[in-house]
Amino acid sequence: MNWEIVIGLETHTQLSTDSKIFSGSSTRFGAAPNTQANAVDLALPGSLPVMNRGAAERAILFGLAVGGKVAPRSVFARKNYFYPDLPKGYQISQYELPVVEGGTLSFFVGEEEKTVNLTRAHLEEDAGKSLHDEFSLASGAPASGIDLNRAGTPLLEIVTEPEMRSAAEAVAYARALHSLVVWLGICDGNMQEGSFRCDANVSVRPVGQKEFGTRTEIKNVNSFRFLERAILFEARRQIELIEDGGTVVQETRLYDADRDETRSMRSKEDAHDYRYFPDPDLPPLVIGQDWIDAVRAGMPELPAAQRARFEADYGLPAYDAAQLTVSRAMADYFEAVARALPAGQAKLAANWIMGEVAATLNREEKDIDAAPVSAAALAALINRIIDGTISNKIARDVFAAMWAGENGGDADAIIEARGLKQISDSGAIGAMIDEVLAANPAIVEEYRAGKQKAFNSLVGQIMKAAKGKANPQQVNELLKEKLG
Protein backbone atom coordinates (compact mmCIF):
# COMPACT_ATOMS: atom_id res chain seq x y z
CA MET A 1 0.00 0.00 0.00
CA ASN A 2 1.20 3.50 -0.80
CA TRP A 3 1.01 6.07 1.95
CA GLU A 4 0.71 9.86 2.01
CA ILE A 5 2.16 11.99 4.81
CA VAL A 6 0.04 14.90 6.05
CA ILE A 7 1.86 17.66 7.93
CA GLY A 8 0.82 20.88 9.61
CA LEU A 9 3.18 23.12 11.55
CA GLU A 10 2.69 25.33 14.59
CA THR A 11 5.60 27.71 15.00
CA HIS A 12 6.32 29.64 18.18
CA THR A 13 8.05 32.85 17.16
CA GLN A 14 9.54 34.89 19.98
CA LEU A 15 8.81 38.55 19.30
CA SER A 16 11.74 40.94 19.51
CA THR A 17 10.42 43.27 22.19
CA ASP A 18 12.61 44.58 25.00
CA SER A 19 10.01 43.73 27.63
CA LYS A 20 7.54 40.90 28.14
CA ILE A 21 4.07 40.76 26.71
CA PHE A 22 2.21 41.54 29.94
CA SER A 23 4.92 42.93 32.23
CA GLY A 24 7.86 45.30 32.18
CA SER A 25 10.47 42.59 32.81
CA SER A 26 13.35 42.30 30.37
CA THR A 27 13.36 39.62 27.66
CA ARG A 28 17.18 39.53 27.45
CA PHE A 29 18.48 35.99 27.01
CA GLY A 30 21.07 34.42 29.29
CA ALA A 31 20.52 36.26 32.58
CA ALA A 32 20.92 34.44 35.89
CA PRO A 33 17.81 32.37 36.74
CA ASN A 34 14.82 34.29 38.10
CA THR A 35 16.47 37.72 37.82
CA GLN A 36 14.09 38.87 35.08
CA ALA A 37 10.74 37.99 36.61
CA ASN A 38 8.55 40.49 38.43
CA ALA A 39 5.30 40.15 40.38
CA VAL A 40 3.22 39.62 37.21
CA ASP A 41 5.56 36.89 35.93
CA LEU A 42 5.56 35.19 39.34
CA ALA A 43 1.73 35.39 39.53
CA LEU A 44 1.79 37.10 42.91
CA PRO A 45 -1.66 37.99 44.29
CA GLY A 46 -2.92 41.40 43.16
CA SER A 47 -0.59 41.71 40.16
CA LEU A 48 -2.32 42.49 36.87
CA PRO A 49 -1.13 42.07 33.27
CA VAL A 50 -0.79 45.06 30.91
CA MET A 51 -0.57 44.45 27.16
CA ASN A 52 2.71 45.33 25.41
CA ARG A 53 1.86 47.52 22.39
CA GLY A 54 5.07 46.51 20.62
CA ALA A 55 4.02 42.84 20.59
CA ALA A 56 0.70 43.77 18.99
CA GLU A 57 2.45 45.88 16.34
CA ARG A 58 4.70 42.96 15.40
CA ALA A 59 1.66 40.71 15.05
CA ILE A 60 0.00 43.30 12.79
CA LEU A 61 3.14 43.51 10.66
CA PHE A 62 3.21 39.75 10.24
CA GLY A 63 -0.47 39.65 9.31
CA LEU A 64 0.04 42.27 6.62
CA ALA A 65 3.12 40.49 5.27
CA VAL A 66 1.29 37.19 4.71
CA GLY A 67 -1.92 38.78 3.43
CA GLY A 68 -3.92 37.71 6.47
CA LYS A 69 -6.84 39.50 8.08
CA VAL A 70 -5.81 41.59 11.08
CA ALA A 71 -8.71 41.32 13.50
CA PRO A 72 -10.20 44.68 14.57
CA ARG A 73 -10.99 43.01 17.90
CA SER A 74 -9.22 40.00 19.37
CA VAL A 75 -9.53 38.47 22.81
CA PHE A 76 -7.04 36.97 25.25
CA ALA A 77 -8.02 33.69 26.85
CA ARG A 78 -6.76 31.59 29.71
CA LYS A 79 -5.44 28.19 28.66
CA ASN A 80 -5.67 26.12 31.82
CA TYR A 81 -3.19 23.38 32.57
CA PHE A 82 -0.75 22.52 35.35
CA TYR A 83 2.99 22.48 34.89
CA PRO A 84 5.68 23.46 37.41
CA ASP A 85 7.06 26.29 35.23
CA LEU A 86 3.60 27.86 34.75
CA PRO A 87 3.13 29.82 37.99
CA LYS A 88 -0.41 31.07 37.33
CA GLY A 89 -1.76 27.61 36.55
CA TYR A 90 -2.81 28.93 33.14
CA GLN A 91 -1.21 30.49 30.08
CA ILE A 92 -2.54 33.71 28.58
CA SER A 93 -3.16 32.98 24.91
CA GLN A 94 -5.82 33.57 22.25
CA TYR A 95 -8.38 31.01 21.19
CA GLU A 96 -11.64 31.94 19.43
CA LEU A 97 -10.59 35.42 18.32
CA PRO A 98 -6.89 35.52 17.28
CA VAL A 99 -5.12 38.68 16.19
CA VAL A 100 -4.51 37.36 12.63
CA GLU A 101 -6.63 34.99 10.58
CA GLY A 102 -5.70 33.43 7.24
CA GLY A 103 -2.83 34.37 4.98
CA THR A 104 -0.44 32.41 2.78
CA LEU A 105 3.28 31.78 2.54
CA SER A 106 5.03 30.82 -0.69
CA PHE A 107 8.39 29.08 -0.84
CA PHE A 108 10.51 26.84 -3.06
CA VAL A 109 11.11 23.12 -2.69
CA GLY A 110 14.08 22.76 -4.98
CA GLU A 111 13.00 24.74 -8.03
CA GLU A 112 9.26 24.12 -7.53
CA GLU A 113 7.24 26.92 -5.93
CA LYS A 114 4.69 25.91 -3.29
CA THR A 115 2.14 27.89 -1.28
CA VAL A 116 0.76 26.94 2.13
CA ASN A 117 -2.35 28.46 3.68
CA LEU A 118 -2.10 29.77 7.22
CA THR A 119 -4.95 29.13 9.63
CA ARG A 120 -4.12 31.84 12.14
CA ALA A 121 -1.46 33.64 14.13
CA HIS A 122 -2.16 34.41 17.75
CA LEU A 123 -0.37 36.16 20.58
CA GLU A 124 0.51 34.36 23.78
CA GLU A 125 3.00 34.31 26.62
CA ASP A 126 5.79 31.79 26.96
CA ALA A 127 6.12 29.57 30.01
CA GLY A 128 9.13 29.35 32.29
CA LYS A 129 11.78 26.67 32.03
CA SER A 130 12.39 23.56 34.11
CA LEU A 131 16.05 22.81 34.83
CA HIS A 132 16.92 19.20 35.59
CA ASP A 133 20.71 18.91 35.42
CA GLU A 134 21.90 21.91 37.42
CA PHE A 135 20.62 20.96 40.88
CA SER A 136 20.91 18.27 43.52
CA LEU A 137 19.75 17.90 47.10
CA ALA A 138 22.14 17.98 50.05
CA SER A 139 21.96 14.20 50.05
CA GLY A 140 23.22 14.17 46.48
CA ALA A 141 19.88 13.06 45.06
CA PRO A 142 18.90 14.73 41.77
CA ALA A 143 16.52 17.68 41.89
CA SER A 144 14.84 20.08 39.48
CA GLY A 145 14.68 23.86 39.50
CA ILE A 146 12.44 26.44 37.85
CA ASP A 147 13.71 29.50 35.95
CA LEU A 148 10.93 32.02 35.31
CA ASN A 149 13.01 34.46 33.26
CA ARG A 150 11.28 33.22 30.11
CA ALA A 151 7.78 33.31 31.62
CA GLY A 152 5.78 36.03 29.91
CA THR A 153 8.07 36.38 26.89
CA PRO A 154 5.87 37.38 23.92
CA LEU A 155 5.18 34.72 21.32
CA LEU A 156 3.34 34.76 18.03
CA GLU A 157 2.15 31.23 17.32
CA ILE A 158 1.73 30.73 13.57
CA VAL A 159 -0.44 27.78 12.52
CA THR A 160 -0.68 26.27 9.04
CA GLU A 161 -3.38 24.19 7.42
CA PRO A 162 -2.40 20.49 7.16
CA GLU A 163 -1.31 20.93 3.53
CA MET A 164 2.30 19.77 3.44
CA ARG A 165 2.99 16.31 2.08
CA SER A 166 6.68 15.68 2.74
CA ALA A 167 9.34 16.42 5.31
CA ALA A 168 11.26 18.40 2.68
CA GLU A 169 8.22 20.58 2.05
CA ALA A 170 7.72 21.20 5.78
CA VAL A 171 11.37 22.19 6.20
CA ALA A 172 11.21 24.49 3.17
CA TYR A 173 8.13 26.19 4.67
CA ALA A 174 9.82 26.53 8.06
CA ARG A 175 12.91 28.06 6.46
CA ALA A 176 10.75 30.51 4.50
CA LEU A 177 8.83 31.49 7.63
CA HIS A 178 12.06 31.91 9.58
CA SER A 179 13.43 34.10 6.80
CA LEU A 180 10.26 36.22 6.75
CA VAL A 181 10.06 36.93 10.49
CA VAL A 182 13.75 37.84 10.59
CA TRP A 183 13.32 39.94 7.42
CA LEU A 184 10.45 41.84 9.08
CA GLY A 185 12.53 42.37 12.21
CA ILE A 186 9.86 40.86 14.47
CA CYS A 187 12.06 37.95 15.63
CA ASP A 188 15.82 37.46 15.87
CA GLY A 189 15.42 33.89 14.60
CA ASN A 190 17.97 32.44 17.04
CA MET A 191 16.95 28.79 17.17
CA GLN A 192 19.63 27.84 19.70
CA GLU A 193 18.09 30.30 22.17
CA GLY A 194 14.55 29.09 21.45
CA SER A 195 13.39 32.14 19.52
CA PHE A 196 11.93 29.98 16.74
CA ARG A 197 10.46 26.59 17.68
CA CYS A 198 8.32 24.26 15.58
CA ASP A 199 5.66 21.77 16.60
CA ALA A 200 4.94 19.31 13.79
CA ASN A 201 1.54 17.62 13.52
CA VAL A 202 2.05 14.42 11.53
CA SER A 203 -0.38 11.80 10.27
CA VAL A 204 -0.44 9.27 7.44
CA ARG A 205 -3.19 7.94 5.20
CA PRO A 206 -3.44 5.66 2.16
CA VAL A 207 -2.93 7.54 -1.10
CA GLY A 208 -6.35 8.61 -2.40
CA GLN A 209 -8.09 8.58 0.99
CA LYS A 210 -9.79 11.88 1.85
CA GLU A 211 -10.08 11.44 5.61
CA PHE A 212 -7.06 12.37 7.72
CA GLY A 213 -5.38 9.77 9.85
CA THR A 214 -4.83 10.15 13.60
CA ARG A 215 -2.18 12.79 14.17
CA THR A 216 0.63 13.05 16.65
CA GLU A 217 2.33 16.29 17.64
CA ILE A 218 6.13 16.49 17.83
CA LYS A 219 6.96 19.32 20.25
CA ASN A 220 9.56 22.07 20.26
CA VAL A 221 11.91 21.09 17.43
CA ASN A 222 14.56 23.81 17.25
CA SER A 223 16.55 22.99 14.12
CA PHE A 224 15.59 22.47 10.50
CA ARG A 225 17.67 19.29 10.28
CA PHE A 226 15.99 17.81 13.34
CA LEU A 227 12.56 18.84 12.02
CA GLU A 228 13.11 16.84 8.84
CA ARG A 229 14.47 13.82 10.69
CA ALA A 230 11.66 13.91 13.27
CA ILE A 231 8.94 13.98 10.60
CA LEU A 232 10.57 11.19 8.59
CA PHE A 233 10.90 8.98 11.67
CA GLU A 234 7.37 9.67 12.89
CA ALA A 235 5.79 9.00 9.49
CA ARG A 236 7.74 5.75 9.19
CA ARG A 237 6.74 4.75 12.74
CA GLN A 238 3.05 5.34 12.05
CA ILE A 239 3.11 3.44 8.75
CA GLU A 240 4.87 0.45 10.32
CA LEU A 241 2.45 0.51 13.26
CA ILE A 242 -0.63 0.48 11.01
CA GLU A 243 0.79 -2.18 8.68
CA ASP A 244 1.48 -4.38 11.71
CA GLY A 245 -2.18 -4.12 12.73
CA GLY A 246 -1.76 -1.44 15.38
CA THR A 247 -3.49 1.91 15.87
CA VAL A 248 -1.93 5.36 16.00
CA VAL A 249 -2.72 7.12 19.28
CA GLN A 250 -3.28 10.88 19.37
CA GLU A 251 -0.44 12.04 21.58
CA THR A 252 2.37 14.53 22.06
CA ARG A 253 5.82 13.17 21.26
CA LEU A 254 9.37 14.45 21.75
CA TYR A 255 12.16 14.06 19.21
CA ASP A 256 15.37 12.56 20.62
CA ALA A 257 18.17 13.72 18.32
CA ASP A 258 20.75 11.37 19.85
CA ARG A 259 18.66 8.30 19.06
CA ASP A 260 16.99 9.81 15.98
CA GLU A 261 13.53 8.81 17.18
CA THR A 262 10.36 10.27 18.65
CA ARG A 263 9.05 9.06 21.98
CA SER A 264 5.77 9.56 23.78
CA MET A 265 5.49 12.45 26.25
CA ARG A 266 1.78 12.51 27.08
CA SER A 267 -1.62 11.98 25.54
CA LYS A 268 -2.53 14.83 23.20
CA GLU A 269 -5.13 17.16 24.67
CA ASP A 270 -8.05 18.59 22.71
CA ALA A 271 -9.05 22.24 23.06
CA HIS A 272 -11.83 21.47 25.55
CA ASP A 273 -9.27 19.89 27.89
CA TYR A 274 -7.73 23.33 28.42
CA ARG A 275 -11.06 24.93 29.43
CA TYR A 276 -10.38 28.15 27.52
CA PHE A 277 -12.28 31.22 28.69
CA PRO A 278 -11.71 34.99 28.18
CA ASP A 279 -9.18 36.47 30.59
CA PRO A 280 -11.11 38.87 32.84
CA ASP A 281 -7.94 40.85 33.64
CA LEU A 282 -7.30 41.90 30.03
CA PRO A 283 -9.58 43.98 27.81
CA PRO A 284 -10.02 42.97 24.16
CA LEU A 285 -7.18 44.02 21.86
CA VAL A 286 -8.75 46.64 19.58
CA ILE A 287 -6.82 47.46 16.41
CA GLY A 288 -8.13 50.38 14.38
CA GLN A 289 -7.49 51.00 10.69
CA ASP A 290 -5.24 53.96 11.52
CA TRP A 291 -2.95 51.67 13.49
CA ILE A 292 -2.86 49.12 10.66
CA ASP A 293 -2.10 51.87 8.12
CA ALA A 294 0.73 53.20 10.29
CA VAL A 295 2.31 49.74 10.52
CA ARG A 296 1.89 49.21 6.77
CA ALA A 297 3.62 52.52 6.06
CA GLY A 298 6.72 51.29 7.90
CA MET A 299 6.87 47.88 6.22
CA PRO A 300 10.06 46.97 4.36
CA GLU A 301 9.91 45.65 0.81
CA LEU A 302 8.75 42.06 1.23
CA PRO A 303 10.67 39.05 -0.10
CA ALA A 304 8.06 38.23 -2.76
CA ALA A 305 8.08 41.79 -4.08
CA GLN A 306 11.86 41.88 -4.07
CA ARG A 307 12.03 38.55 -5.90
CA ALA A 308 9.74 39.91 -8.60
CA ARG A 309 11.81 43.09 -8.86
CA PHE A 310 15.07 41.15 -9.15
CA GLU A 311 13.56 39.15 -12.00
CA ALA A 312 12.25 42.28 -13.76
CA ASP A 313 15.10 44.72 -13.12
CA TYR A 314 18.09 42.37 -13.27
CA GLY A 315 16.78 39.63 -15.55
CA LEU A 316 17.38 36.91 -12.97
CA PRO A 317 15.70 33.49 -13.21
CA ALA A 318 13.02 32.88 -10.57
CA TYR A 319 15.20 30.36 -8.73
CA ASP A 320 18.14 32.78 -8.48
CA ALA A 321 15.88 35.58 -7.26
CA ALA A 322 14.45 33.28 -4.58
CA GLN A 323 17.90 32.22 -3.37
CA LEU A 324 19.10 35.82 -3.17
CA THR A 325 16.12 36.92 -1.08
CA VAL A 326 16.39 34.33 1.68
CA SER A 327 17.36 37.23 3.94
CA ARG A 328 17.37 41.01 3.72
CA ALA A 329 21.11 41.01 4.29
CA MET A 330 21.67 38.65 1.34
CA ALA A 331 19.35 40.68 -0.90
CA ASP A 332 21.07 43.94 0.05
CA TYR A 333 24.49 42.37 -0.58
CA PHE A 334 23.49 41.18 -4.06
CA GLU A 335 21.95 44.50 -5.01
CA ALA A 336 25.02 46.42 -3.87
CA VAL A 337 27.24 44.17 -6.02
CA ALA A 338 24.92 44.32 -9.05
CA ARG A 339 24.70 48.12 -8.94
CA ALA A 340 28.50 48.39 -9.00
CA LEU A 341 28.78 46.35 -12.21
CA PRO A 342 28.15 47.36 -15.82
CA ALA A 343 24.57 46.94 -17.07
CA GLY A 344 23.66 43.37 -17.92
CA GLN A 345 26.12 41.73 -15.52
CA ALA A 346 23.74 41.04 -12.61
CA LYS A 347 23.58 37.33 -13.45
CA LEU A 348 27.36 37.11 -13.01
CA ALA A 349 26.98 38.73 -9.58
CA ALA A 350 24.23 36.24 -8.71
CA ASN A 351 26.39 33.30 -9.80
CA TRP A 352 29.26 34.45 -7.61
CA ILE A 353 27.11 35.07 -4.55
CA MET A 354 25.20 31.79 -4.89
CA GLY A 355 28.45 29.97 -5.69
CA GLU A 356 31.73 31.01 -4.08
CA VAL A 357 30.27 33.33 -1.44
CA ALA A 358 27.49 30.98 -0.29
CA ALA A 359 29.77 27.94 -0.29
CA THR A 360 32.37 29.69 1.85
CA LEU A 361 29.74 31.01 4.25
CA ASN A 362 28.25 27.51 4.62
CA ARG A 363 31.65 25.94 5.16
CA GLU A 364 32.49 28.43 7.91
CA GLU A 365 28.92 28.52 9.28
CA LYS A 366 28.68 32.29 8.88
CA ASP A 367 25.90 34.63 7.84
CA ILE A 368 26.36 37.08 5.00
CA ASP A 369 26.66 39.89 7.57
CA ALA A 370 29.91 38.29 8.76
CA ALA A 371 31.45 37.87 5.30
CA PRO A 372 34.96 39.40 5.29
CA VAL A 373 34.57 40.25 1.58
CA SER A 374 32.27 43.27 1.31
CA ALA A 375 29.86 43.83 -1.56
CA ALA A 376 32.11 46.59 -2.89
CA ALA A 377 35.17 44.32 -2.76
CA LEU A 378 33.35 41.50 -4.56
CA ALA A 379 32.15 43.92 -7.23
CA ALA A 380 35.74 45.07 -7.75
CA LEU A 381 36.80 41.45 -8.28
CA ILE A 382 33.97 40.71 -10.72
CA ASN A 383 34.82 43.86 -12.66
CA ARG A 384 38.30 42.43 -13.22
CA ILE A 385 36.70 39.37 -14.82
CA ILE A 386 34.49 41.56 -16.98
CA ASP A 387 37.35 43.77 -18.22
CA GLY A 388 39.54 40.74 -18.96
CA THR A 389 42.20 41.42 -16.32
CA ILE A 390 41.78 37.89 -14.89
CA SER A 391 39.87 34.75 -15.82
CA ASN A 392 36.98 33.35 -13.82
CA LYS A 393 39.24 30.50 -12.66
CA ILE A 394 41.96 32.85 -11.39
CA ALA A 395 39.26 35.01 -9.80
CA ARG A 396 38.35 32.12 -7.50
CA ASP A 397 41.92 32.05 -6.19
CA VAL A 398 41.85 35.82 -5.72
CA PHE A 399 38.53 35.53 -3.88
CA ALA A 400 40.01 32.99 -1.45
CA ALA A 401 42.90 35.37 -0.78
CA MET A 402 40.49 38.26 -0.25
CA TRP A 403 38.47 36.17 2.21
CA ALA A 404 41.67 35.40 4.12
CA GLY A 405 42.48 39.12 4.31
CA GLU A 406 45.54 39.02 2.05
CA ASN A 407 46.67 42.51 0.94
CA GLY A 408 43.83 44.03 2.92
CA GLY A 409 41.29 42.03 0.91
CA ASP A 410 41.90 44.26 -2.12
CA ALA A 411 41.44 42.39 -5.41
CA ASP A 412 43.73 44.64 -7.46
CA ALA A 413 46.50 44.47 -4.87
CA ILE A 414 46.33 40.66 -4.77
CA ILE A 415 46.33 40.40 -8.58
CA GLU A 416 49.37 42.69 -8.77
CA ALA A 417 51.28 41.03 -5.93
CA ARG A 418 50.76 37.52 -7.32
CA GLY A 419 51.30 38.47 -10.95
CA LEU A 420 47.93 37.11 -11.98
CA LYS A 421 47.02 39.51 -14.76
CA GLN A 422 45.60 37.65 -17.71
CA ILE A 423 47.66 37.47 -20.89
CA SER A 424 45.58 39.18 -23.55
CA ASP A 425 48.33 39.98 -26.04
CA SER A 426 47.39 38.08 -29.20
CA GLY A 427 51.03 37.82 -30.27
CA ALA A 428 52.10 36.17 -27.02
CA ILE A 429 49.12 33.81 -27.05
CA GLY A 430 49.73 33.00 -30.70
CA ALA A 431 53.34 32.05 -29.96
CA MET A 432 52.21 29.66 -27.20
CA ILE A 433 49.67 28.09 -29.54
CA ASP A 434 52.34 27.57 -32.21
CA GLU A 435 54.58 25.79 -29.70
CA VAL A 436 51.78 23.49 -28.52
CA LEU A 437 50.70 22.66 -32.09
CA ALA A 438 54.27 21.89 -33.11
CA ALA A 439 54.70 19.58 -30.12
CA ASN A 440 51.43 17.70 -30.67
CA PRO A 441 50.99 16.85 -34.38
CA ALA A 442 49.02 13.68 -33.59
CA ILE A 443 46.40 15.60 -31.60
CA VAL A 444 46.18 18.17 -34.39
CA GLU A 445 45.43 15.38 -36.88
CA GLU A 446 42.76 13.95 -34.55
CA TYR A 447 41.04 17.33 -34.44
CA ARG A 448 41.14 17.66 -38.21
CA ALA A 449 39.61 14.19 -38.39
CA GLY A 450 36.60 15.55 -36.48
CA LYS A 451 37.40 14.70 -32.85
CA GLN A 452 36.27 17.66 -30.69
CA LYS A 453 38.02 16.24 -27.61
CA ALA A 454 41.32 16.85 -29.37
CA PHE A 455 40.55 20.58 -29.49
CA ASN A 456 39.84 20.63 -25.76
CA SER A 457 43.11 18.80 -25.13
CA LEU A 458 45.04 21.44 -27.06
CA VAL A 459 43.30 24.25 -25.15
CA GLY A 460 44.24 22.58 -21.87
CA GLN A 461 47.90 22.37 -22.87
CA ILE A 462 47.94 26.00 -23.98
CA MET A 463 46.40 27.13 -20.69
CA LYS A 464 48.95 25.00 -18.83
CA ALA A 465 51.78 26.65 -20.76
CA ALA A 466 50.31 30.04 -19.85
CA LYS A 467 49.96 28.97 -16.20
CA GLY A 468 46.23 29.60 -16.45
CA LYS A 469 46.71 33.27 -17.25
CA ALA A 470 45.86 33.32 -20.95
CA ASN A 471 42.51 34.80 -21.93
CA PRO A 472 40.38 31.67 -22.59
CA GLN A 473 38.24 33.36 -25.22
CA GLN A 474 41.27 34.54 -27.16
CA VAL A 475 42.89 31.11 -26.88
CA ASN A 476 39.80 29.48 -28.39
CA GLU A 477 39.50 32.02 -31.20
CA LEU A 478 43.19 32.00 -32.18
CA LEU A 479 43.46 28.22 -31.95
CA LYS A 480 40.49 27.73 -34.28
CA GLU A 481 42.00 30.27 -36.65
CA LYS A 482 45.37 28.47 -36.73
CA LEU A 483 43.82 25.03 -37.12
CA GLY A 484 41.87 26.30 -40.12
UniProtKB/Swiss-Prot annotation:
EC top class named in words: ligase
Pfam families, sorted: GatB_N (PF02934), GatB_Yqey (PF02637)
- The answer to whether the entry has keyword Ligase is yes
Keywords from UniProt, A to Z, are: ATP-binding, Ligase, Nucleotide-binding, Protein biosynthesis
Q: Which InterPro entries match?
A: Asn/Gln-tRNA_amidoTrfase_suB/E (IPR017959), Asn/Gln-tRNA_Trfase_suB/E_cat (IPR006075), Asn/Gln_amidotransferase (IPR018027), Asn/Gln_tRNA_amidoTrase-B-like (IPR003789), GatB (IPR004413), GatB_C_1 (IPR042114), GatB_Yqey_C_2 (IPR023168), Gln-tRNA_amidoTrfase_suB_CS (IPR017958)
What Enzyme Commission number(s) appear in the record? 6.3.5.-
Q: Name one GO biological process term.
A: translation
Per its record, the protein catalyses: L-glutamyl-tRNA(Gln) + L-glutamine + ATP + H2O = L-glutaminyl-tRNA(Gln) + L-glutamate + ADP + phosphate + H(+); L-aspartyl-tRNA(Asn) + L-glutamine + ATP + H2O = L-asparaginyl-tRNA(Asn) + L-glutamate + ADP + phosphate + 2 H(+)
Q: Which PROSITE patterns match?
A: GATB
**According to the lineage, what is the superkingdom?**
Bacteria
Q: Is rRNA processing a UniProt keyword of this protein?
A: no
Gene Ontology MF terms: asparaginyl-tRNA synthase (glutamine-hydrolyzing) activity; ATP binding; glutaminyl-tRNA synthase (glutamine-hydrolyzing) activity
- What job does the chain carry out? Allows the formation of correctly charged Asn-tRNA(Asn) or Gln-tRNA(Gln) through the transamidation of misacylated Asp-tRNA(Asn) or Glu-tRNA(Gln) in organisms which lack either or both of asparaginyl-tRNA or glutaminyl-tRNA synthetases. The reaction takes place in the presence of glutamine and ATP through an activated phospho-Asp-tRNA(Asn) or phospho-Glu-tRNA(Gln).
- Share what the entry says about its subunit structure, partners included: Heterotrimer of A, B and C subunits.
The family this protein is said to belong to: Belongs to the GatB/GatE family. GatB subfamily.
State the PANTHER family in the record.
GLUTAMYL-TRNA GLN AMIDOTRANSFERASE SUBUNIT B MITOCHONDRIAL AND PROKARYOTIC PET112-RELATED (PTHR11659), GLUTAMYL-TRNA(GLN) AMIDOTRANSFERASE SUBUNIT B, MITOCHONDRIAL (PTHR11659:SF0)
Concerning HAMAP family, the annotation shows:
GatB (MF_00121)
Protein's recorded name? Aspartyl/glutamyl-tRNA(Asn/Gln) amidotransferase subunit B
Q: Which organism is it from?
A: Bordetella pertussis (strain Tohama I / ATCC BAA-589 / NCTC 13251)
Q: What is the lineage of its organism?
A: Bacteria, Pseudomonadati, Pseudomonadota, Betaproteobacteria, Burkholderiales
